[in-house]
Regions:
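Acidic-enriched and Gly/Ser
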Residues: 2-233
Length: 234
């Protein structure tokens, strides 16, 4: 099989400079050497751009390893992501993510082909320009919100717009304009300041990489005294 590299840095051929995203939020598989663990591939964890992850059913019985890039079921079409965990730890991670046993689990279609990567590269090349234009559209509509990132689905049929807003925003007109402008299905997803920092990355006052960009997934409240002690903005 050909090796491919995703622009989110999570593919198996990442350079050293992509180390932050390559290892971001990965679970250490301490069962990897246990006999029979490799054969337990019914459920697979897949990571997409930055911190977004999903769990998928390996219904075709593909032999998958960490770092394999796969095409997975989406609505509509398919998405492209990197396998980050297989084996017996996946059900434990699903419970940690509060996925119920009767939840609808989508499928892994295949390991990516060159044609899949062509669509993926074309879609990802539009993300920055789409973000800049969408910010101007939101401003022209008088919406008090900041669009911090845009993520195109692997086949280019859908785009997720991540935004920050202090108050409730009625973005029905915005969705209509965005759909007409970019000719894709639109999903708006509100995130907090720490989630945005996790997506962008950065260095904390301690001199190390931000916790929310490396390992933290549960953003509990930070007390004023703790923020003052860490010398972070209040």
């Amino acid at each position: 099989m050909d090796d491919f590299k995703l622009k989110n840095g999570s593919g198996r051929l990442c350079c050293g400079g992509c180390g932050r995203q390559n290892n971001k939020l990965n679970t250490y598989d301490w069962l990897a050497d246990i006999p029979g663990n490799a054969e337990e591939q019914v459920m697979v964890e897949v990571q997409f751009k930055n911190t977004r992850k999903g769990y998928y059913k390996n219904s075709n019985g593909l032999h998958l390893e960490k770092g394999d890039i796969v095409a997975v079921e989406a609505s509509p079409g398919h998405d492209i992501g990197t396998v980050t965990l297989t084996g017996r730890l996946v059900p434990l991670q699903m419970r940690k993510a509060n996925l119920k046993p009767d939840a609808e689990i989508r499928r892994i279609y295949r390991k990516v082909k060159p044609v899949d990567m062509e669509k993926y590269e074309e879609a990802k090349s539009r993300e920055h320009d789409t973000m800049i234009r969408s910010r101007k559209i939101a401003e022209s509509l008088g919406l008090q919100m900041k669009i911090g990132d845009v993520e195109y689905q692997g086949d280019g049929n859908k785009a997720i717009f991540y935004y920050i807003a202090d108050e409730r925003v009625d973005f029905r007109q915005l969705i209509k304009v965005l759909a007409e402008t970019f000719r894709v299905r639109i999903e708006m997803k509100q995130i907090g300041a720490r989630q945005e920092a996790g997506r962008i990355g950065g260095i904390g006052p301690c001199g190390r990489e931000l916790c929310c960009a490396t390992w933290m997934t549960n953003f509990v409240s930070v007390s004023t005294s703790a923020a003052r002690f860490q010398d972070i903005s209040l």
